């Protein structure tokens, strides 16, 4: 198949490149508006208890769970004439909007409500509303209201917060972060590619394919928005993934093409040979990454599902562009792929000699790997112990869903959230629970009384009255019951994501209700989300392990190497998760990164990072094993040959894998500049994983383990050997001559 693709691509190179240019232009135009069509939610499933309760509240009880807050502050106090005028005006205007219901404010609410809408310092009053239309419409409405009323005038400051405003700020920030990340990554990538290849022309090719992948990623995301909800967080992640993989894959193919030219092949034959060999590696790598991302579709959350759909499509686009477009460009360029040597001027400036080619057996990588294999057992023990130690903080991981603290301290929604936590202890801003008794019109006095006696509950608001510690303290707030049923609000200062918060939720559930009760609120959302993720996680892990094992078995014909790869990847990712807990949950380096440690991680992020990092780690595993296997098949297949072929394989791939890892780290690392905290975690975690995987894992641990296992590396039971002979992926031609290495380069 690869041979036919390469032959077709090199037979009609101009037509293919013109078609690619037209496709890139279409993708760019079609995907330009994608950010405005993406959603900020997707952290809970539609059939979860909290989701069903939220729908009933939205449909039957206007404003029961406000998703929008305006904070009106005056140094002269919330009761000053200026604050009252602004607060009343804002509440009235929002109340006239068709997409706003349940509007209430400190200045217009009755006494039972009014007291809790004023800050403890007396300077701030609140305007609450529920913005309808779903997450997308609500966040757009929040942005419009914030633009109209936000700011400071006549000594009164108005700021927007609440879930809808948070979503709007996140959408806006992520779009800005994407522009910044690409602005940082692309120039740095161009510089590193030029250093790696020397030739400006050769360096431009992976970058061009990467830009094509970005355009394709935007168009793919936009296309999926026509049929399903797609998370806004997929914007940065899939474009970064597309750029990183496209550059990675192109680097392998361009390097192999230049090698084949040095070996004496003609332009077209060299391009075809590059696709047959490096293209085969690219195909397996893309298949592994795509399968790992596809596993995300088993989770019933569109936050993860959108990564499955868009991620697989972007991986396919990056691989296809590398396998189809690059050969066309390479055959047209021919020897000019080595033109414009940017390093020549630097060598003349510093009086350095021209590089000479060194056989792999004389390279630094070859010597290093042989030393590692001579000390295989201690090297293995030290690295495994270090990875386990780094991963140990993951044993104390805690999970919770994102709130305004994912945003930087300077954002309006973050400022409002901080004010609510500090100055409005009685406001139910998600910390408590809202309980829906759908279709029930009976008395709830006993139920409200019992709920108010639960530890940590500060008050219970119900149609029977306001209850504190078992006693009725005030008349019932209006609107808590109607023909559809009724709801109760449980106010608490307990962190919903803490152990105490989950314990309190269980105690509230245990209180006998007069009718079937549905719980809403952050504690219930957290419990529902963790249950949903936990129920599907074993299946996801099993599918990733199985798919990786099958692909690597078809690639190598061994059952030992796939098992080793799965175990090593799991160990490597455990270390990465330990570092993320240490930094983002426990707060180490938080000042350096500018993030707020909340004491927990967003539970969907480790799953997303596990699937993606697992697939990406296999990228270098496949590339390394492909070269080791080529040498192994050409050998006598003895124990000594095992040692020699491992050293040869690492020597062949060490420099190019290091360069590929550095390039991928630049693209992913640019996301650390993001202002949304768990996007920073995503970028930093994957960057560290890629760098560690390409150096410590592939350069040290894998050779050490392959030395310890000897010829057993290539073992498979008889039936599986025959299965591989029939269905496995085999070399299409003889193994190529060794890839020389530039002297003096790592």
Specify the residue positions occupied by each region the protein language model found.
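Membrane-embedded transmembrane helical bundles of large multi-pass transporters/channels
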Residues: 1-37, 115, 133-399, 514-517, ...
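Short beta-strand segments
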Residues: 71-72, 255
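Structured non-transmembrane domains adjacent to transmembrane bundles in polytopic membrane proteins
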Residues: 46-67, 74-167, 396-591, 600, ...
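Loop-to-helix "switch" segment enriched in basic
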Residues: 38-42
